[in-house]
Amino acid sequence: MMGSVQTAPADDRFRGWLRIEPVAGLSEERWDPLLICVAGYILTAVGRLHQLFGALEAIHLAAIAGALTVVIYLANTREVRRPGAVRCLTTNLVGLLVFWMVLSLTTALNAGVSVDLVFNNFIKTALISFVVAASIRSVDDVERLAFVYLAGAVIYSAIVMTRFDVGSGNDWRLGHLYYYDANDYATFTVTAMPLGLYFLNRAQRRAVRLFAAVGLVVLTLGFVWSGSRGGFIAFAAVAAYVVFRFKAIPLRRRLLSTALVVVVLLATASDHYWEQMSTITSDTDYNHTEESGRLQIWSRGVGYMLANPLLGVGPGNFAVAEGTLSPMAARQQFGIGVRWNAPHNSFIQIGAELGFPGLALYIAILVSSFVALRRAGDLRPSLTASLIGFVVGSFFLSLAYSEMLYTLVALAVGVQKVTATRQVQPRPCCESLN
């Protein structure tokens, strides 16, 4: 209590920073070692915290966080965290996607590329995504991890903007950053913005609201610096959803919060930025006219799907297909260089690499994640908006296997787990941040 002369135990003081009022009828849950490790995983796998600070990368923080998360989960004895608690349509679909990726190894153009992606990357991502969902004990934990996701995006943005500069001319926007390129980063910021709006309007602790407000400014500035046109489209989609569907926050406050972001965008966007955005619908843009533009790449990607409808060209092999199967590939025998392009579309990426069954599984994972959020209470609009931001942004990017997506999917599954058997009752929002 604020006026008490007694000192709370250290554990209670730590819990007070991110303590969430439990759903009515549940016992109060604290931060525990598993949830702390899950937070560390999100900060490293999505927020790339270890790459921002050399000392953390030197000690292999990402590997440590992931390993500890799995080890502590395996030692779990609580019923709410048992594997059966998160066996649902979405997790089953992710499991089927992993199986289909392994099956697609048999027809991969370059087996080494596929084996590396499947066994050194995606299986780990899918496994820890399952553990993230399983670690969630209540809606409280979802709020905690959503705040960690937001904090990771804000920290990443702040560091990037202090270490990378934008100049003039062709150098007016950010380029390749830590792990993400500028377009990936723009989508990351867009997925975090709805969470910032949620904590800005729902948190009772002033420090948390201040962090959310400053975080939104930082995210918006970083978003502008990215100069991403696909990110701009994703931002517009999220903004429309926030204004018209974000019912957990009163309309007046939604409009004011959105206005804050828009004002920062208008105040910081340069003429180069708006010139770049104006080319989105231009028929003369390289994406429309050049063979390395997105439309031509997507067209060839559909061709790879039709030529390999069942198992695709193999996980991670889209670029290999560009260099060996595309109409331009024959030029290489004459000493003419050919660009081995990325798909620049997550749906084309999955469809070309895993065939139509893989594409169907991917779409089903996305749809089931949205469905999983239908009873998420106050968190539904923010997490739904984050997923919308990812889906729209990833339409122009190669993010089908990304930790960003499967962390959001894990939060959706976690919400479904803790609300599946009971109606979410009104409760003090964000008391975990009080």
Q: What residue spans do the PLM features occupy?
A:
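Transmembrane signal-anchor hairpin modules in multi-pass inner-membrane enzymes, especially those
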Residues: 1-103, 109-113, 117, 137-147, ...
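Alpha-helical transmembrane segments of multi-pass inner-membrane proteins
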Residues: 2-4, 25-28, 67-70, 95-106, ...
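Loop-to-helix entry and N-terminal half of a specific, functionally important transmembrane alpha helix
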Residues: 36-46, 98, 216, 341, ...
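Membrane helix-loop boundary segments at the extracytoplasmic
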Residues: 45-55, 349-354, 379-418
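Membrane-interface helix caps and helix-loop-helix hairpins in membrane proteins
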Residues: 52-55, 107-116, 177, 224-225, ...
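Membrane-interface micro-motifs in multi-pass membrane enzymes
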Residues: 56-63, 117-120, 178-190, 230, ...
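Long extracytoplasmic/lumenal interhelical loops at the membrane interface
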Residues: 176-178, 284-299, 306-307, 311-354, ...
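Hydrophobic alpha-helical transmembrane segments
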Residues: 355-367
